[in-house]
From Swiss-Prot:
<dbReference type="GO" id="GO:0022900">
    <property type="term" value="P:electron transport chain"/>
</dbReference>
<keyword id="KW-0249">Electron transport</keyword>
<feature type="transmembrane region" description="Helical">
    <location>
        <begin position="78"/>
        <end position="109"/>
    </location>
</feature>
<feature type="transmembrane region" description="Helical">
    <location>
        <begin position="214"/>
        <end position="234"/>
    </location>
</feature>
<keyword id="KW-0597">Phosphoprotein</keyword>
<feature type="transmembrane region" description="Helical">
    <location>
        <begin position="242"/>
        <end position="262"/>
    </location>
</feature>
<keyword id="KW-0997">Cell inner membrane</keyword>
<keyword id="KW-1278">Translocase</keyword>
<dbReference type="InterPro" id="IPR011303">
    <property type="entry name" value="RnfD_bac"/>
</dbReference>
<feature type="transmembrane region" description="Helical">
    <location>
        <begin position="301"/>
        <end position="321"/>
    </location>
</feature>
<feature type="transmembrane region" description="Helical">
    <location>
        <begin position="148"/>
        <end position="168"/>
    </location>
</feature>
<dbReference type="InterPro" id="IPR004338">
    <property type="entry name" value="NqrB/RnfD"/>
</dbReference>
<feature type="transmembrane region" description="Helical">
    <location>
        <begin position="20"/>
        <end position="40"/>
    </location>
</feature>
<comment type="subunit">
    <text>The complex is composed of six subunits: RsxA, RsxB, RsxC, RsxD, RsxE and RsxG.</text>
</comment>
<keyword id="KW-0285">Flavoprotein</keyword>
<comment type="similarity">
    <text>Belongs to the NqrB/RnfD family.</text>
</comment>
<feature type="transmembrane region" description="Helical">
    <location>
        <begin position="123"/>
        <end position="143"/>
    </location>
</feature>
Amino acid sequence: MVFRIASSPYTHNQRQTSRIMLLVLLAAVPGIAAQLWFFGWGTLVQILLASVSALLAEALVLKLRKQSVAATLKDNSALLTGLLLAVSIPPLAPWWMVVLGTVFAVIIAKQLYGGLGQNPFNPAMIGYVVLLISFPVQMTSWLPPHEIAVNIPGFIDAIQVIFSGHTASGGDMNTLRLGIDGISQATPLDTFKTSVRAGHSVEQIMQYPIYSGILAGAGWQWVNLAWLAGGVWLLWQKAIRWHIPLSFLVTLTLCATLGWLFSPETLAAPQIHLLSGATMLGAFFILTDPVTASTTNRGRLIFGALAGLLVWLIRSFGGYPDGVAFAVLLANITVPLIDYYTRPRVYGHRKG
């Protein structure tokens, strides 16, 4: 009897790329819901614009490359890229910004390298950074959370602001950004950095309405906890591994704690770092991208720790208030080096 030895792999599972991407999309529902609750309908409009733009851009490039459009679009990677970019930008940013960022992310940051699996950088973060550098004012014009906002735009107003820049009653972004204290609001991280540079004490800064939350910034703490809930669900579904989120959050916490202990008058407390900005979104949904992250367990720990350190450095000493996108891209650069030095030893191989 002749036995045939099949080629590897010898273990199989049902985790196709499309299913993993779908799980990530489903896990994003709590975070999206929280952003809708605290920042209004603009987030939903941005998601729809980004999704359509991502699918059309991907289809166009695939058509030009004479590849199967339907089969590739079914992997859901274009949708995920659009979603991650849409939830990262201000909810009432002009419509052309999310379209431009999404098209750039899909065509330049993904398809130009050969498509899914070939891109060295996270496409959504490339699109975000391009927008942030090109249009810094619009990209930092976040609305105050509803609990401290004076003017809360409805669904129709959100659409009108996104497409025309004004509400039906003639209000603009300057009006919508007013908080209950009559001052234009920014994110907790942006407010802290700007106020410290203006010479305000931390005690004064913590009295601002934006810090009226139980743990950190108003609204933002719940948004981050919602993204955390989605991330925990991804871990439970085994769609991502624990190494990157854990090392990222532990490193960020340690750096923020040490910095705050040594310089409490100039550096933010650890809970502000953990529950403000894109911390949890980055930890569970962006850094864990299987294409652009490290592929070994030790490498994942190093990769996550490096990103956590970079986020704290950029937030504390850099020119941008958040820093997650820049940290992700800088960490992406190091992945080949990290993977090279953390390769597991081949079974049976002895050290020379």
